[in-house]
Amino acid sequence: MSALIPASEVILRHQDTFSDKQVVIAGDVQDLLPARLEARSVKVHTAWFHHRQTLARALGEQAVQFGLVADAALGGGCDTLIYYWPKNKPEALFQLTNLLSLLPLGCDVFVVGENRSGVRSAEPMLAAWCPLAKIDSARRCGLYHGELVQQPRFDAEAFWQSYQLEDVVIKTLPGVFSRDGLDNGSQLLLSTFDRPFQGHVADIGCGTGVLSAVLAKGAAGVQLTLSDAHAPALAASRATLAVNGLQGEVLAGDVYSAISGRFDMIISNPPFHDGMQTNLKAAETLIRGALNHLRIGGELRIVANAFLPYPDLLDAVFGNHQVLVQNGRFKVYQAIHQVKRSRDKGPKRR
């Protein structure tokens, strides 16, 4: 999170605009621009746990909010919003409706993002609340500015959706992976569970909680720990467990950062993007750290795009792997913890 992304470089072209402003920065914040921006004050809202950790170290705990929604304290005294447009338009609508409902009329609003992310959609989206005009174009990004003329009404409940998988209800929110239905990769992974599983399961990068919910529904012997870095995913997973009458611990964390102890199985459909960029770091951390969180005989079972270079890494870490099932796009990998490394302990929260 050290180098600035192109959108931040565009913001810094307008540094003088912010020198006497009280700024809130939100949206898809991926770097330390909030710490480098010269302003009267800077506060941040992020929906990503790992970015929250980095920004809190740079700005202080009180300057950074992490969560599904921003609260009124964030907007207090603010006269400027800088919003980083995410790649997901419904998530942008959710976040901007929330943020603009908290900010005072007359607040300056800047929206910045890569052209390929669809940042042009900001103009029609905000037309009724904050008419925007494009004020800069550089680094394949657009920067838009407007003034808040009407506060939107924000109702988080109105953004919830759900879908059904046989007798399992999946709850979901804007920005959560596979919001509109079960993705093909997760479907392939679930197809490998052809008999009830018993034991402690860690669902890393849990998203909607679909993997855990399907695995645990009707299987009384499953104990669940779910973790994700994305606040909407955490909310969706908690809601999915609740609506299906399932118990489980849902933790905000970056891969294994929130959990300790050992499990009988780790399951995941790991992401390979960070914003608009390809990034295999999370999946590599998942694989490299798995032995520290598996009991002897425990397994890592993940689904991944077939072209991703995971077989060699699995062999290097586990000394084994097999492909349980594959189709044209995806493979489900299984690797078994066969070598005793330290005394096993049940999963627990740090």
Curated annotation (Swiss-Prot):
Its EC number is 2.1.1.172. Signal peptide: none annotated. It is found in: Cytoplasm. The keyword Ribosomal protein does not apply. It catalyses: guanosine(1207) in 16S rRNA + S-adenosyl-L-methionine = N(2)-methylguanosine(1207) in 16S rRNA + S-adenosyl-L-homocysteine + H(+). GO terms for molecular function: 16S rRNA (guanine(1207)-N(2))-methyltransferase activity; nucleic acid binding. GO terms for cellular component: cytoplasm. The keyword Transferase applies. Gene3D superfamilies: Vaccinia Virus protein VP39. Pfam families: MTS (PF05175), MTS_N (PF08468). Keywords: Cytoplasm, Methyltransferase, rRNA processing, S-adenosyl-L-methionine, Transferase. Disulfide bonds: none annotated. It comes from the Bacteria. Monomer. Belongs to the methyltransferase superfamily. RsmC family. Specifically methylates the guanine in position 1207 of 16S rRNA in the 30S particle. This is Ribosomal RNA small subunit methyltransferase C.
